[in-house]
């Protein structure tokens, strides 16, 4: 990511100094930059002090861009360069950092007159080179100074030409929005993986046939211009060759590269990726129901520890997924699956945006959800034009909408796709397929729109053992009433 950013800024015309804890990484970047015609100069450094001094005198302020693993590594680098920082310098932290840690660094830097901006960067290393989606958050003066540069660098919305970057808000808001972006991404990734599995293992479709289907979904309709469908179709077509990719992978005389990929997602288990986990924790702590995002994350966790999973499989002896027995009409199945995937994608967006809205209110950030959707229109993993076209007009301009299901068009779409969602869940469950995100979306719609939940019984039991209190149905001020403890308690079993 850091290398791609360096190339991109040099191409814009900036002189770029680079440094890394591992000097080998610097040398690799410099080697890659040879014989290029970038407008700006790229200079590498082994010594961190010489690196920081190389920027002196070139501008009134030094601008640093971090592309560093979250947590202690970024703190360590800040400690290394702090003595060379001067009042007015700006640090852009482009890592996937926890927003609270960002705010802690902002306080440290504020004392020495330095601005620390939490810069969410989305789109993977390809977009980092050609134009990512950016979500900067921090003090307004520093943001105003760097925005012209970020607007040059950011991806551009194909429809409007607007750069996919905006001032998110103060403090850690930029990294919070990027965290939620990654949470939405997790829900969508799981949904599409589940759909692929249903098509391949459930309906016996080949990879290229599924690629054709994904391409058709991406071409038009509610799932149009969706990044994950785009790359999903692309990777499904990649076959092994005698040469492979030139780096030792994908070597073979036939078959698909996808068959070389084990079912292990380890970025969560080994702590190299924290944003999906933080999204789940934030949704729980801020009382936002986000089951599609959460259960997608939990399947990733289970996938990572394959050793343990294989042992559990021996103990549970649960049937493996089998060909789908229901819905014999394959075209009807595809239509239902299209609607179910769309519903789960849309629910992922609803859950993420509701989390941002709640955090913005809690923290006083004044985030415009419409601008979040605007910067997600290009350069990022959750790009989905059809969904953005539904949501963005309804939430732009801080209209105070905190529950996305209040939006008429959103409610209509979730209502319309509900029967297909149910059909897919029933067919998949009957044939023992893995559908955590899709099934969680179905339950989400059921209980989010439920008028008589089984929690009535739960509330009574909690009152029984803990005197938690309850509200009375049909009583003004209690039904529906505020989210607060009920005034009634019944002595179900008097203490003796």
Curated annotation (Swiss-Prot):
GO molecular function: NADP binding; phosphogluconate dehydrogenase (decarboxylating) activity
Any GO BP: pentose-phosphate shunt, oxidative branch
Residues that coordinate or bind substrate: 96, 122-124, 181-182, 300, 468
Class of the enzyme per the UniProt entry, highest EC level: oxidoreductase
EC number(s) per entry: 1.1.1.44
SMART domains documented for this protein: 6PGD
UniProt keyword list: Cytoplasm, Gluconate utilization, NADP, Oxidoreductase, Pentose shunt
Region (Disordered): 476-496
Pathway this chain belongs to: Carbohydrate degradation; pentose phosphate pathway; D-ribulose 5-phosphate from D-glucose 6-phosphate (oxidative stage): step 3/3
Catalytic residues (positions): 178 (proton acceptor), 185 (proton donor)
InterPro entries: 6-PGluconate_DH-like_C_sf (IPR008927), 6PGD_dom2 (IPR013328), 6PGDH_C (IPR006114), 6PGDH_NADP-bd (IPR006115), NAD(P)-bd_dom_sf (IPR036291), Pgluconate_DH (IPR006183)
Record: residues binding NADP(+): 13-18, 24-26, 68-70, 96
Taxonomic superkingdom: Eukaryota
Family: Belongs to the 6-phosphogluconate dehydrogenase family.
PANTHER family reported for this sequence: 6-PHOSPHOGLUCONATE DEHYDROGENASE
Function: Catalyzes the oxidative decarboxylation of 6-phosphogluconate to ribulose 5-phosphate and CO(2), with concomitant reduction of NADP to NADPH.
Name this protein carries in UniProt: 6-phosphogluconate dehydrogenase, decarboxylating
Originating organism: Emericella nidulans (strain FGSC A4 / ATCC 38163 / CBS 112.46 / NRRL 194 / M139) (Aspergillus nidulans)
